[in-house]
Amino acid sequence: MSRTYSLVRRAGLLTRISAPALAAGFALAANPALAQSDDVDPDVIIVTAQLREQNVQDVPLSITAVSGDLLEARSQTTLTDITAQMPNLLLQKNPAGQGNSVRVFIRGVGQSDQSPSVEPGVGTYIDDIYYGTVLGSAFDLTDIERIEVLRGPQGTLSGMNTLGGAIKIYSRKPEGSGGYVEASLGNLGRIDVKASADFTVVPDAVYARFTGVTRNRDGHVTRYDYGCLNPDDFDVISGALPSIASGGDCELGEMGNQQMYAVRGSLRIAPEGSPLEINVMGDYTKDTSETQASVLIASGESVTVGRAAGYVDRSGLSIPYQGVAYDDRFVTYGPYRRADAVLNDPYASYANFYDPGVMYSAIGAPPGPPSGYIAGEPLGPFIAPSAAGAEAWGVSATIDLELSDNLALKSITGYRHMFSETGSDNDHSPVVFIMDDSDYTHEQFSQELRLNAVLLEDKLDLVVGGFYYDASTRYNARIHTPFSGFCPADTPCFSFINDDTADLQSYAGFANVAFAVTDRLTLEGGIRVTHEKKEYLYNRLNPDGNGDYLPLSNPGNPLTGFVGVYEETITDYRAVASYNITDDAMVYAQFSTGFKGGGVAPRPYVYQQIRPFGAEKLKAYEVGFKTDLLDRALRLNGSIFHMEYEGYQGTPTTCLGLDDQPLPVTGGGIPGLCGQYLNIGDAKVRGFELETTIRPAAGLQIDGAMSLTDFEFTSINYPTTAIIVGANRPGIGEFKWSAGIQYEALLGDNIGSLTPRIDVNYTPGYCGNFDCDPNVDVDSYTLVNARLTYRSPDEDWSISLEAMNLFDKFYFLNKFATFYVNGQPGRPREVAVTVRRRF
């Protein structure tokens, strides 16, 4: 088949590459992602998006591949950094209180909820091992070979939970020699050190690679003690707001810092001339970072301004136990900050993660055994950790066996374990509205088998296989929102221990085929059948850990011991036609489907709210082109898509029973207090992606991208929702663009080279909720990053000066609102110097 690569590698070399592929220009977005051998053009980028090795320009789908070299050139160190230059990709850390988790969306489709009852909407893979949770997924990008971002549903190629697309990260494999040591020093306390070393264990047979990294940065939001800074406040004088700061600067800590280290080891067994290659990897990460940066934008005093009639006004809500009003004196910056406020700082918060004595039992809990206390009686202080850390480790093994020149077998086995601790004080004040201390323990095992074949004189490429996945997640939390406004006056009622377990099993069989009808026309198709089952066990305990927690709406209706079950079988399809107009120009048309698994109610308050919801499903129609023009000085790739989104998972305003009727108030039907997810409605998503790389002269390179996502709900299945037909999805912007330019100036044979690079990226604004409340709208922003790198003549030494957010732009990544509004500010300008020694 024209322009395809071999199924396997023998002794690290590609065994079959067509001449047109070798001529296929330069790597998308600038640098080579793979340069495994001198026999391969160093500018060819090889990807495995279609489960076989291909030049990225031959893959008939919307894909961006980025090399590890380009990640370094752009000063991108974590997975969330790549969002700036990726068309139609939103990848950010979640707001404070959601741990070390990320929100990932491709083409407006994805997931941000970290609950184990909800599945990711974009699949993330590390060396082909599926990672089944958004927690702990802000991966470090040290020693990365390449990243592939596949846009659109990948149900047949990648499988479960690739509704919006897939992100695939590939680490560098051992080659037998070489390595580096690198150190970075910058403002905001940045100290980074990383190193990697390659060894030959057995000549021409066994190789090893070890990599380590540590990253340290100060937080960019400072937490202050309100009582310390405001000693004349009448609530401070009365003692209702105690001062807890121990230092004279009134600081309690930071938010948004980074403290982590990670190690990875890999072993490659590839005897020269042998049909067998085995790659074994193990990694460990310890992240002790504090919670994500967040600030109070508006309190209950101001958040209701301009809201529609009927909106619940909590502006006068107070804290009965403390007798403190929750008002704008706790706002430190912006239009709702009071003129006489002590602080005028966009990077400041009064969150103290402390409740001096408001730990309560549930309404109606009887005195004496088993709890031993009276409802409403304070039990002692509650201190939540200012944490968003994670501890994770994993092992994997990939076995490639070449059965013949035309037949190969691959086995991919992986096990991962992750523990994440998070705490929140999301009201950003010393009063007690919303606090929690949550732990997540996630374990998963996966096994995939693939059989690749090249048949009919290389005209037919065939991949068949199976996939198995087993995961268990324990969610243990202390939820503390005692005066959230849902209870009778002066009655604390919403404080309990959550100890849930979610178990998921999934297995699938798949087949993908590509047939070269002619030297230029190729037809491809695929099918995958997936069966999955999730069981979710609920446990709710009183704050002292004794006795079932009795829900606020029905004291005789506990949740403990109830199990919710979701089970579904889903079939995905793919059909593609691609045509090579010339050796350097290809057009294609594709139809594909994908799904995001269903689940059960993530946060029910009574057992009647336990109800399964089905999978989200997507049908996508895409046409595109890939070209290398002007003697390969210009690369231009583009795609246009239309997607039909079925079964959007969302929360109704009033919970429904299994008969689709609103639950009674005494049975979980409290308006505004629903912990269900339902398949609320359908939507359509349209847009495009366009990417280019231009090399007008030796050493000069320009790259750019632009994209558009138009998301619109087309039908609503249930009336008890805030969503209306025609609404956009919150958190999703429309038009996005980026551009970068660099020039490598050769200073002389014995001097080296100097490479300046500038990147500019524009992120669109979006509505923060379905109402497009102006209080939670996120404005668009444009960021500029710069880097200047000197390399020695033999490139064994390099030194770089970099500036991220060069013009110190203040912006919000996201905002969140209930009866107050908080936001996550982006990091201010950061400057650093990096020195690297290669050997």
Describe each model-derived feature in a short phrase.
Residues 523, 639-644, 671-770, 836-838:
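Gram-negative outer-membrane beta-barrel transporters
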Residues 1-74, 79-84, 278, 395, ...:
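N-terminal Sec signal peptide and the immediately downstream disordered periplasmic leader
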Residues 41-176, 623:
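Acidic, small-polar-rich N-terminal luminal/periplasmic segments of exported/outer-membrane proteins
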Residues 121, 133, 142-151, 156-237, ...:
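Outer-membrane beta-barrel translocator/receptor signature
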Residues 440-448, 496, 502, 506, ...:
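Outer membrane beta-barrel strand-and-loop segments of large Gram-negative receptors
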Residues 247-252, 258-462, 635:
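Outer-membrane beta-barrel domain signature, strongest for Gram-negative TonB-dependent receptors
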Residues 644, 651, 761-769, 789-839:
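C-terminal beta-signal and adjacent terminal beta-strands/loops
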Residues 268-270, 451-452, 461, 467-469, ...:
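Structural signature of Gram-negative outer-membrane beta-barrels, strongest in the C-terminal barrel
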